């Protein structure tokens, strides 16, 4: 009887413990991949539970409007992008960016090996294949900093086939995605990571609603803390996070994940810049001022916007999560 009682008590304790966790829905910006690894790692290794959270991760994709899902209350947190966040707040969305997992944007221009600089692309007037979103993010920056012109633009359809067929094509790409496909096809492309040339945007940010911040600031703080600990853990041993990534996105291969991790580390996207000394996820007023300045210069945002309405530094880890 004692044994049966113990078993019964044991089976009861799990749901009771689960009931004490705050349920949270976090939406990513694309299908599961290495660039989301820290969040999946925090879930896989129990870091979210350690901070009293029961987190469901929902994938983004081409048809998913993350901002809409966040503002409508279907998600508590959303993976965002600094430039998009500024626009959202300007349009009256009640959202705030509370952390940045990536100190630099993984967006790059990719060219064939004989192209050695961003200046050369302009000098030779090469066609640059970009997606529509580039017009309100990095393209205006390339125009103001490098003199690129709109007549260089060609529409990018997220296929590297045109690039592989023509040595004079330049295209946008994600550091760990298109170059991987090109290398598989036997080309070692020139990759110009825009962040390395001064493009100021934070990426893979955590956005939440002003309502949640008001209602439960402690929950926001715990989600940020656990997520950034997840990133530190992911770079030490990514296996737990990778298992969840592949479960969510069965088309993702081990090789592609390994390439993604290698590129994040090589370019210090998560652990470089301010994060190296001030902890993963860190944001600064100075950096947001640069983002604001670029957007003002490019005519992407109205002068009436107060940049401090876009972000808050109050929910960053109190104990920095050093890489």
What do the predicted segments below correspond to?
Residues 19-165, 169-173, 192:
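Short, glycine-/small- and polar/acidic-enriched structural segments
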Residues 42-45, 51, 69, 73, ...:
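Structured segments of extracytoplasmic/periplasmic soluble domains
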Residues 285-323:
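Conserved C-terminal helix/tail region of periplasmic/extracytoplasmic solute-binding proteins
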Residues 83-84, 158-253:
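Pocket-lining segment of extracytoplasmic ligand-binding domains
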Residues 1-4:
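N-terminal export leaders
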Residues 215-298:
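Secondary-structure end/capping motifs
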């Amino acid at each position: 009887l004692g044994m049966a009682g113990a078993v019964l008590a044991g089976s009861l304790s799990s749901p009771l413990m689960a009931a004490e966790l705050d349920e949270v829905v976090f939406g990513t910006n694309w299908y599961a991949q290495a660039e989301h690894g820290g969040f999946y790692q925090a879930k896989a290794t129990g870091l979210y539970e350690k901070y009293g959270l029961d987190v469901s991760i929902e994938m983004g994709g081409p048809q998913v409007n993350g901002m809409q899902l966040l503002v409508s209350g279907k998600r508590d947190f959303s993976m965002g992008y600094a430039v998009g966040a500024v626009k959202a707040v300007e349009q009256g969305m009640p959202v705030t960016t509370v952390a940045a997992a990536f100190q630099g944007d993984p967006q790059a221009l990719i060219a064939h090996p004989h192209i050695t600089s961003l200046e050369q692309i302009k000098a030779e007037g090469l066609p640059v294949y970009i997606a529509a979103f580039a017009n309100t993010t990095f393209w205006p920056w390339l125009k103001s900093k490098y003199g690129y012109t709109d007549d260089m633009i060609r529409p990018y359809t997220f296929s590297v086939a045109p690039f592989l067929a023509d040595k004079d094509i330049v295209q946008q790409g994600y550091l760990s995605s298109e170059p991987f496909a090109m290398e598989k096809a036997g080309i070692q492309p020139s990759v110009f990571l825009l962040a390395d040339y001064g493009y100021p945007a934070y990426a893979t940010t955590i956005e939440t609603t002003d309502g949640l911040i008001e209602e439960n600031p402690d929950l926001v703080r715990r989600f940020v803390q656990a997520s950034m600990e997840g990133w530190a853990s992911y770079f030490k041993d990514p296996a737990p996070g990778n298992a969840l990534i592949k479960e969510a996105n069965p088309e993702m291969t081990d090789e592609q994940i390994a390439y993604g991790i290698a590129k994040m580390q090589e370019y210090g996207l998560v652990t470089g810049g301010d994060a190296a000394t001030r902890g993963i996820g860190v944001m600064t007023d100075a950096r947001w001022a640069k983002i604001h300045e670029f957007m003002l210069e490019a005519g992407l945002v109205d002068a009436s916007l107060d940049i401090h309405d876009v972000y808050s530094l109050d929910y960053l880890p109190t104990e920095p999560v050093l890489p």
